[in-house]
Amino acid sequence: MVHFTAEEKATIMSLWGKVNVEEAGGEALGRLLVVYPWTQRFFDNFGNLSSASAIMGNPKVKAHGKKVLTSFGDAVKNMDNLKGAFAKLSELHCDKLHVDPENFRLLGNVMVIILATHFGKEFTPDVQAAWQKLVSGVATALAHKYH
């Protein structure tokens, strides 16, 4: 279980309140698919994923990215119980979708990059450390159901 200090929680919640979920979600998923092209195999029904510009402009990528980042909001609300908050998604990704759990870590790291680009100087090393801790905790929670 990940333990967050009161300061880390406040830091995460403060920044989360400023995140444009639709924009950042689409960017995060898009970057994941571009930088780690083997992840595209889970999205074969998304249409044209042939180039970086096609991926970043793909409406299905943007919509699913928003969905992913919206569910990430559950992590912000449930920092003290990430495993419980992501139990159903862990089961879905393990048993039905068969997603390699390493992809959760990759997506978390991409999210940190997106937040850094969106918030610039406001994304200090302390802010990054808190967010890195959160995305790592989410990746671990999502991988929980894997055998």
From Swiss-Prot:
PROSITE patterns cross-referenced by the UniProt entry: GLOBIN
Listed transmembrane segments: none
Globin domain residues: 3-147
CDD domains linked: Hb-beta-like
Tissue-specific expression: Red blood cells.
Keyword Heme among record annotations: yes
GO CC, any one term: blood microparticle
Subunit structure, interactors included: Heterotetramer of two alpha chains and two epsilon chains in early embryonic hemoglobin Gower-2; two zeta chains and two epsilon chains in early embryonic hemoglobin Gower-1.
Job of this protein: The epsilon chain is a beta-type chain of early mammalian embryonic hemoglobin.
Protein's recorded name: Hemoglobin subunit epsilon
Organism lineage: Eukaryota, Metazoa, Chordata, Craniata, Vertebrata
Encoding gene, per UniProt annotation: HBE1
